Amino acid sequence: MPPTQAESVIKNIIREIGQECAAHGEIASETVVAFMVKAVVLDPSNGFNMDRTLIKTDVQKLVKLCVARLLDNKNPSLDTIKMQVYFDMNYTSREDFLEEHHRVLESRLGIVSREITDNRASAREELENLYRKIVSYVLLRSGLGSPTDIKIVREATAALQSVFPQAELATFLTLSKKDKERQLKELTMIVTGIRLFNRDCGKGGEGIDDLPAILHEAIPTTTQHIDSQLQIAQDQAFRYTAILEKVTNNPLMAKELQPYMLKEALYNVRQYEIFLQTVLSDIITCAEEVEMMIKQLAAQLEQLKMAVKSKTAVPTSQVFPIFVALASLWMSFQDETVLISVLSNLTTNLELFLGTHELLFPEKVMLGLLDGVVVKSDLTRIEEHMEERVELADFRTQEWLFPETTANFNKLLIQYRGFCGYTFAVTDGLLLPGNPAIGILKYKEKYYTFSTRDAAYTFAENPDHYIHLIKEKAKKNAELIQLLELHQQFETLIPYSQMRDVDKHYIKPITKCDNGTQTDTHILPPTTMRTYEWNEWELRRKAIKLANLRQKITHSVQTDLSHMRRDNTSQVYPLKEASTQSKREGSSRVPRPQIFIAGLRGGQSKTTYGVKVNLTRAVDET
């Protein structure tokens, strides 16, 4: 069957089921009906084949079963499914809610903004009308009073005129549409800051609620109410768990109590508890944000008072940023107020899905079932087995995580919302809290906790078997898919709010161990930049030199001695050490000079004549 045709068939089935329920006086939303259709098809006891196209008899059977389950107002399972659908359709995370809230405000202001930015006023009356529209826009965007209240309008107009006189409208009209929108937002922030400052000084603030005081009173009240509801839900869950524990050990009693739907009631109250914890976590975050913002508000107002004091004129560059920061802070107070209101209403509406407990289990019935039963809290059950610990030596192929060896131990995403998977599988649906101190089993990149060490050992022997049992149990009770977070195993029933997290990877454990490493003193060779200059004046001189070179001309001159010069290269063999040895040593002796002078004694003549006689032997004389 083509996808479009299949969708058409499903829509017709949902419409027919809704009409049947309406005929019996029960109004069921399309979302609840669609969820119930998938739940009935998943239940193997109904005999539907997921791989085969539905024929007419199958459709009639499906409609009949869905209508019967939707009209069974005494079934806690139906209340749990309705609760899950309601919470999924009405709850969003804090970030998503604030983002959507701001988007809605922008869309509502779009019409007023376009009336201002598209205006082509020229006459005096038209300009005055445009200025009034700007005042209304400022009031609507800031949320500080109604634009129909004369006192509030006068106060806002006076604040606006102090920063944006009507004479500047002509300049404003010459701006582009984008610049106009930006200036309108800036004017809103500044005017809001001025009005808040005047309110703090006792000179204005008409129509401005004391949001810090309102939040300071509303948050503790809401928190106390949720805490009390959470305590009641937990006490009820502990009582149901104690009775079911007793029933597990007594088969005869199990048959007697089967019509009471104890397990379905336990799932209902556990789901309610989980939703309350989610809402309470958001409210605690709100309380922390509000506490921080109250301190910031006091600091901003004090800074503004110090800047203004008794001065007649203050530079805009000094006070405008503070006005903007003050307005931004106040808008955050408004966001927190809306968020607290939504969460409070959500909590109140969740209580509507708990009506079956009073019908099925009045106090007299509960006291009879609790006879001889010890009611234990989740904390008590965990403390009873705190000393138990899985021995790693017993498991060579399984990986176990412990608090002292895992850095992000408390951030791991535990399967089945932290309930013991083994107990749930072998007792046909009993929910007992897992004790992480015993050890967390890591199997196929998923993490499992157990109520006792014996449960951990047995589950670890064949995890796939127990995982399959849990999946089959969830097919019979569709509310378990969201309660135990089995969305990856049933992708057709993933809540809309969790669709974006389907492909999100699980947090991987960061294991800790004692280890030592040694590195070289200098891993990389030293790099010294010879051309590096830290002095900016030296860099400036180099820049000027390079700039001057662009204006220079190169001249060449040749002389008689240089015109024949050219670049020359030569290649030589590298130096090497060499030595020689002669066969014999020889020497030679030169003749000794023998020079004589004759006639020194004189003679007969008066004049003496000396004669030099060289008798030195020749060199080559043998």
From Swiss-Prot:
User: Entry's PANTHER family?
Assistant: CILIA- AND FLAGELLA-ASSOCIATED PROTEIN 206
What InterPro entries does the annotation carry? Answer: FAP206
Where would you say this protein principally sits, based on its record?
cytoplasm
Localization of this protein = Cytoplasm, Cytoskeleton, Cilium axoneme; Cytoplasm, Cytoskeleton, Cilium basal body
| GO BP annotations, alphabetical order | axoneme assembly; cilium movement; regulation of cilium beat frequency; regulation of flagellated sperm motility; sperm axoneme assembly
Q: Which domain of life is it from?
A: Eukaryota
Null mutant: what phenotype? Answer: Mice postnatally develop hydrocephalus, show impaired mucociliary clearance of the airways and are characterized by male infertility.
- Provide GO CC annotations from the record: axoneme; ciliary basal body; motile cilium; radial spoke
Q: Does the keyword Cytoplasm apply?
A: yes
Keywords of this entry = Cell projection, Cilium, Cilium biogenesis/degradation, Cytoplasm, Cytoskeleton
Cystine crosslinks: none
Q: What is this protein called?
A: Cilia- and flagella-associated protein 206
Annotated region Disordered: the residues are 568-593
Q: Which family does it belong to?
A: Belongs to the CFAP206 family.
